[in-house]
């Protein structure tokens, strides 16, 4: 009987810890969302196609407004073999860059600060570009 009681207590504690971690993750995401939405300016993105699919950057640029961004420049990446898309942060604060990356499907963020850059960030499209389209089409518009 004592063993059963110990197992039940351990189960309740582990469920509580798991829900606490989920709550903390949700709070972090909400904080990033608030940080992103706090800025009045639309984020200027340079979109570089690294997937080899012709016209992909132009296609995705049409729905970027849903993430509070607009395309400042469309171009090809340095090569067309990017397996994974990523966001290169040039001028955004860290919280805004990560909030934008979350709205674009949870992309990794690479920091290459350049205050003289023409765009706030560079979106490099890789072979996993569908996750960006899905994220943009299934989220509420920011602006």
Language model feature labels by segment:
Residues 1, 142-143:
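Solvent-exposed alpha-helical segments and adjacent loops
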Residues 1-16:
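Hydrophobic membrane-insertion alpha-helices, especially the h-region
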Residues 2-3, 39-46, 76-83:
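Short low-complexity stretches enriched in small and charged residues
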Residues 10-12, 36-38, 50-54, 85-91:
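Generic detector of short, locally flexible boundary/turn motifs and exposed helical patches
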Residues 16-36:
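N-terminal hydrophobic targeting segments that direct proteins to the cell envelope
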Residues 34-66:
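Short extracytoplasmic
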Residues 59-63, 67-130:
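BRCT (BRCA1 C-terminal) domain core and associated BRCT-interaction motifs
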Residues 131-142:
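Short, low-complexity, Pro/Ser/Thr/Gly-rich segments in the mature regions of secreted, periplasmic
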């Amino acid at each position: 009987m004592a063993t059963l009681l110990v197992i039940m207590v351990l189960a309740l504690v582990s469920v509580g810890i798991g829900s606490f971690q989920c709550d903390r993750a949700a709070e972090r995401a909400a904080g990033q969302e608030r940080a992103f939405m706090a800025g009045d300016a639309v984020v200027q993105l340079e979109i570089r196609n690294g997937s080899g699919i012709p016209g992909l950057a132009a296609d995705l640029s049409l729905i970027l407004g849903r993430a509070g961004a607009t395309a400042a420049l469309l171009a090809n990446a340095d090569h067309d073999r990017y397996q994974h898309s990523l966001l290169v942060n040039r001028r955004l604060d860290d919280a805004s860059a990560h909030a934008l990356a979350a709205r674009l499907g949870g992309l990794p963020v690479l920091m290459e600060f350049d205050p003289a850059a023409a765009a706030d960030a560079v979106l490099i499209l890789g072979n996993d570009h569908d996750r960006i389209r899905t994220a943009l089409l299934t989220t509420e518009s920011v602006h």
